[in-house]
Amino acid sequence: MTNPKLPPILINKAGSVYYVYTYKNIWDRELKRSKRGESKKIGTILGGQKEGKIRFDEAFLQEHPEFRNYQVERKGKDYVFTPISEEGITLEQARNIKKLHAGATWALDQIVADSPVGEFLKECFPRHKDYKKILSLAYFLILNQNNNVSFYESFAETTRLPYPRALSPSAVTRLFQRIELRDVQRYFSLMRSYLQEDEDNKIILALDSTSISSYSTNLTHIEYGKNKDDDALPQLNVLFLVDQKSGLPIFYRFYDGNVPDVSTIRHTIADQALLNMKNVVLVADKGYNSVKNINDCLINKVEFIFNVRLGTKGCLARELIDEHRKEFADLNSGDPYIRKNIATAKVNWKYDPRPVDGKPASNTASAELYYHMFYDPVIYQEAANKLTESLLTIKKKLLEEEALTEQEEELKEKFFRNDKEKGLVIVNRRVDEYLKYKGFRVLVTDSEKDPVKAWTAYADRWRVEDAFATLKDRLGCNRIRCSDNKALQGKTFVQFIATGLSLMVRSRIRSYMRENKKAGKLNLVYESDSKILQVLNNVMQTRFNHGYYFDEVAGKKIKYFEALDVRVPGAGPETPEEVPEEPETEPLLGTDIEI
């Protein structure tokens, strides 16, 4: 078969891409010789080099259909023709072409590049390119929504990832075992330095914990305790600190499953000291407020905003509410922004600056605390309506001799009494007592005098709750799926990184929707973050020996990249990074990895 004849060709570079042009010579009457006339683009050299395979433009192939049957490659000044099979590819191409899911991981790469996460991982985990492996596993958790790493190898075979080689289950286990506590603490330290670059502003950290269940009996921290998912399984507890400004989780620690939340503040403060964090305000929910925790914060000069429990009769918060009831009845106490009635009480708090176990507290030190009280009449009315509806339903069932549910029996015992003349009647005094503190919230703080700012800081702690929802629901990490203590540290850290990246994705989508609403634009993105990433994951990338090429991106996928504030991947090639294959060795002796 005779090769077709190429027209005159020029090679011109634009940016990082070499383009192929053809031209025609024309006669110059003045110079009395031929010269090069107008040129026309006919193709692109693949691979980003001056030599390589040529991808001809469709317009050229329509004019010269004979070139459809050949792969043309530029080598030096020569052009090599390779016949193409009926399937449209050469045999060499058939061996080396590979399609990868790439759009979602491309977007995640851009988000990582805009944050300190990738840089800090590289600094802390440079060996064996572990930082790339950690990111790749984090992407797997985000896109696969399952933390069973036995699925990772097949996922990596078909997905564009920072670490381009697939990792076997044993290689993943070795990675987890290499992630040591000192390296994790180094990462936390770098994150702390990043947050404290703006020395003028306080760092507000939302603090909370959750329980993660396990079937394993080998892990040190696994104990039966108060399971927050109502699983009848032993658990370990994981505590997160989340920066409320950026939404980034910056610290975690796990502890025994039978340790209540209220007991963890002291250890967290100790960890804070290790991190050498300054100018920090801890924001925590009711489970963390106690006299001991307030004292520990004051002793260690850690500022705090705690939500106070109101369920205990005779507690200080209830007394303060009762003292200020007239203020709550005054409509002028309502704030137009948070839509709550507000009152604040200053309390002179006594504490022992140097407590010793077993000795009575000296209470020689004192601090001024602010008890900010908030009343929402709507919440009160909702509680009153719900209770009234339940009590009237019970009354109706009793009159019609219908059976009561277990919950209704409890309400009957609590709010009804037998009257000799009227029979079973509702005791209004008990109802009033039950509703007396409904609609109230009390925040105690040593530093924030402004009640609205305190409320806002507390309201923003949804970020840590969002972190746990992301970890357990969206990433499928409600089970540990690890039975080795040495690997647990590494797996938890990878899940921590995945949680942070997922929260950054959600934050960008929220910001996009908020800006559209502010500008009065039509919001074209309604799907959840996971749905958006799944759609983008179907943006494919074709891999050749000489590079990677994204398929054309069109339609709503362009809008999704815009919602994530990342650029659409271009047509130019990505050059694959060569990484050595990790040798297959067994996990460290004495380990038992459940995957």
Set out the residue ranges of the language-model regions:
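Basic, amphipathic alpha-helical segments enriched in Lys/Arg and hydrophobic/aromatic residues
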Residues: 483-505
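Short amphipathic alpha-helical "interface-anchor" segments enriched in bulky aromatics
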Residues: 453-481
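Short, surface-exposed basic-aromatic patches at helix termini and helix-loop junctions that form
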Residues: 273-274, 294-303
